[in-house]
Amino acid sequence: MDLMKLITVNASIEKPVDMVWEYWTNAHHVTHWNFASPDWHCPSAESNFVEGGEFHYLMAAKDGSFEFDFWGTFQKIEPQKSIEIVLGDQRKMIVLFEKNAEGTKLTEQFEPEQENAEELQQAGWQAILDQFKQYVTS
């Protein structure tokens, strides 16, 4: 995947790669971790997890003030290694699953959007990844 400037977030998770992969790719699990702060949630998640398939995750403020469909298309899937995605706004993203001595290093790299500062985007995506880690390890 040819990527432009990237923002990178990662987490070291003390669980095996197959479990981390399952929790990241299975839409049932996504609703439990795909939010950056306690005042947001992911009330629905649908995913056709095959190359060329799409995912649609509804991201919503719990007070009902705002919601959006975070979606994309899976371009290339290497089971338990990597997932290449083109997001709905045509930005590219790659997710890497690396086995290590502690368990799994999960890395997400994505092209920034132009509306928000890159630091804000990195902080938000890292917060979601931190929620993911907490969900997987609880």
Language-model features, listed with the residues they occupy:
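A short, structured loop/turn motif at beta-sheet edges
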Residues: 16-18, 49-50, 75-80, 96-105
